[in-house]
Amino acid sequence: MPPPSLLHLHSRAPLQPRPFRMNSRAAPSRVVVCSVASAEGFISAAPILLPDGPWKQVEGGVTAAKGFKAAGIYGGLRAKGEKPDLALVTCDVDATVAGTFTTNVVAAAPVLYCKHALSTSKTGRAVLINAGQANAATGDLGYQDAVDSADAVAKLLNVSTDNILIQSTGVIGQRIKKEALLNSLPRLVGSLSSSVQGANSAAVAITTTDLVSKSIAVQTEIGGVAIRIGGMAKGSGMIHPNMATMLGVLTTDAQVSNDVWREMVRTSVSRSFNQITVDGDTSTNDCVIAMASGLSGLSRIQSLDSIEAQQFQACLDAVMQGLAKSIAWDGEGATCLIEVTVSGANNEAEAAKIARSVASSSLVKAAVFGRDPNWGRIACSVGYSGIQFDANRLDISLGVIPLMKNGQPLPFDRSAASRYLKDAGDAHGTVNIDISVGSGGGNGKAWGCDLSYKYVEINAEYTT
């Protein structure tokens, strides 16, 4: 098990993708009234980037697991009504819940609220998410907005307020449009559905500058019982390891003890969302909430050492990695996903740190965008990762093209390497960078994207 990451964790007890259409990040000029049924038409779904394993994709996202419903509607929180901006995910029973949160000291009001709620109750029933205002750096009034929102949802669902968790995304320094939110909640609750459409509408509603929504669900068999894990996430910019402007909600019908669930979620986050980077900025709002309903019929998983726990952990890792890769793939202005794989390190944590260093390098990202196979930038970013290794054991490959072996540069076809980068960019595909630093058993991955002119344009005009 890897050592704890820097994020904070609090605990309480095949999908067929829609055809992908690249959209402009400019918001449509029309204003609409959006229902759950029409919500998914406002933005395309991300490609499915699920790792291979003993599981299969199923329909439903966060509603695939037994006991969960979701909805996404337009509630008037966005500056323009181009797509939904309020989402709700609920569980029919008291769910065991774990949450991971930003390491940014300027934590948003919903983050502070969730930490408090998770410290006072061992169960959860719902997650409310708004897009448009981050409700970060908003002081006591912003915190009260989060409390009032949770209280209103709790009354509509007839559950305790501390069983409601809150996530927000949008412009930092802006409080939520509470009147619009509160007025929309009855319609949001009335729209809840266990259907695929319910899950898809919620996944759309939480997006901001995202070009695509991110939703996934899988089914696997553990102990002879079919269990499902579903999830949705948002993120495109302000993405960097140790959580970023990314929100995630995970659902499962497995039954897991409180302590085991907390550790499993922490481990999966460290192998997925903490291993992605777009721009090096760590947000005030990042938050992943994971709920386990226990309705699958599988006996409670009570030990991390059990075969059942190990099988479930692998599946949870895969779902979170699939969502994390979709976020990096959808990086603001990106033309391709970058996947960095490191082997031969002393342990998993060291391999992960090296991979993050390479994926985070602005020079590596710019070289990929320029279709320049400048392997020296890769070697440099491995070297400043903070991990000690024998430089004479360093191997680097770009796709199937070896660039360095045992610390020595290799002759290679620069035109072929450049063409590999160009083809990946033209197809919005994946650039694979493989690195070996020795003969140790530590392996790790990280994901990023190239750095384009468009990224600067998007963020220069974000609030104007």
Curated annotation (Swiss-Prot):
Keywords: Acyltransferase, Amino-acid biosynthesis, Arginine biosynthesis, Autocatalytic cleavage, Chloroplast, Multifunctional enzyme, Plastid, Transferase. Heterodimer of an alpha and a beta chain. InterPro entries: Arg_biosynth_ArgJ (IPR002813), ArgJ-like_dom_sf (IPR016117), ArgJ_beta_C (IPR042195). Coiled coil: none annotated. It comes from Sorghum bicolor. It is an enzyme of class 2 (transferase). Its EC number is 2.3.1.35, 2.3.1.1. Catalyzes two activities which are involved in the cyclic version of arginine biosynthesis: the synthesis of acetylglutamate from glutamate and acetyl-CoA, and of ornithine by transacetylation between acetylornithine and glutamate. Belongs to the ArgJ family. The record marks 244-245 as: Cleavage. The lineage of its organism: Eukaryota, Viridiplantae, Streptophyta, Embryophyta, Tracheophyta. This is Arginine biosynthesis bifunctional protein ArgJ, chloroplastic. It is found in: Plastid, Chloroplast. GO terms for cellular component: chloroplast. Its main location: plastid. The active site is at residue 245. It catalyses: N(2)-acetyl-L-ornithine + L-glutamate = N-acetyl-L-glutamate + L-ornithine; L-glutamate + acetyl-CoA = N-acetyl-L-glutamate + CoA + H(+). CDD domains: OAT (cd02152). The record marks 169-170 as: Involved in the stabilization of negative charge on the oxyanion by the formation of the oxyanion hole. The keyword Nucleotide-binding does not apply. Pathway: Amino-acid biosynthesis; L-arginine biosynthesis; L-ornithine and N-acetyl-L-glutamate from L-glutamate and N(2)-acetyl-L-ornithine (cyclic): step 1/1; Amino-acid biosynthesis; L-arginine biosynthesis; N(2)-acetyl-L-ornithine from L-glutamate: step 1/4. SUPFAM superfamilies: DmpA/ArgJ-like (SSF56266). Disulfide bonds: none annotated.
